[in-house]
Amino acid sequence: ENKIITDLLSLVKMDKKAADVNITHMDINQLLEDILKRLRPIADKRNIDLILDCFRPVDADVDEVKFTLAISNLVENGIKYNVDDGWVRVSLDADHKYFYITVADSGMGIPEDSIERIFERFYRVDKSHSKEIGGTGLGLAITKSSIAMHHGTIKVFSKEGEGTTFSVRIPLSYIPS
């Protein structure tokens, strides 16, 4: 119940046109390391490997709280909807204009008919497992809003039974709207 309230408040704040964006120049590599370090105990309970591949040092303008919330949610979902003894791989790369994060997992995948809807508020792919898996159905909506707030994009590639990959692209420099 508390999680639903917290998630709803996050969405409401992000929906405001003049949402408070606190942009700081950050070490993205370190932020990702911190996220994985915080989530590792959850992954370890199911013997899921958390892997971080950073192909180069990346510094960028982000709202630390909103960015961390978005990426944490993708990694948490990779753990939550995975198989025991699976893996979640987070990769970071950049070019002269954008940085790119992929979060890939060895989990159950998303049915093709649900892919278009997973960013909708309260949408759950498999409602029958909602109680045992947990969550509010708001996490991916919050993630998409947070990434959009950074003028970024998110795409999902998935095949049922073969895992899921989320690809995020965010400009290195934040330019206010």
Language-model regions, residue ranges each:
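Conserved catalytic submotifs in the C-terminal HATPase_c
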Residues: 22-25, 44-45, 49-59
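Short beta-strand/loop element within the Bergerat-fold HATPase_c
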Residues: 85-97
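Conserved glycine-rich
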Residues: 151-153
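Short conserved segment of the HATPase_c
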Residues: 110-124
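Acidic ATP/Mg2+-coordinating residue in the GHKL
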Residues: 105
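Short helix-loop "hinge" at the ATP-lid/N-box region of the Bergerat-fold HATPase_c
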Residues: 78-79
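Short alpha-helical Gxxx[C/S/T] motif in the catalytic ATP-binding
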Residues: 134, 139, 143
